Amino acid sequence: AYFYYLVKAMVEAGKKMGFEESLATLLVKQTMLGSFHLINNADKSLDDLIKAVASKGGTTEAALREFEAGDLSKTLQTGILAAERRAKELSKG
């Protein structure tokens, strides 16, 4: 569900940009597929892949600045760790 949640947020942003939902969804899916391909096939770290597509002063860099300002990485990690805690609780019965 985590990835679906991210895709949904990206599609919603596309709709706010004026794209029809179907086109926004297609663009996000293509972006995800391209990203998966690079993660799966490139001999680079995730940090290197991020640097490779985040041009200085570019659009991706602007988005990443907003993600960092909102501490998106920490928020995602907190959610995943909450799921782990809940899984442990459920396994205890």
Positions of predicted regions on the chain:
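Active-site-proximal catalytic alpha-helix in oxidoreductases
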Residues: 1-15, 26-39
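Membrane-interface starts of transmembrane alpha-helices
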Residues: 20-24
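NAD(P)-dependent Rossmann-like dehydrogenase/reductase catalytic/cofactor-binding core
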Residues: 25-93
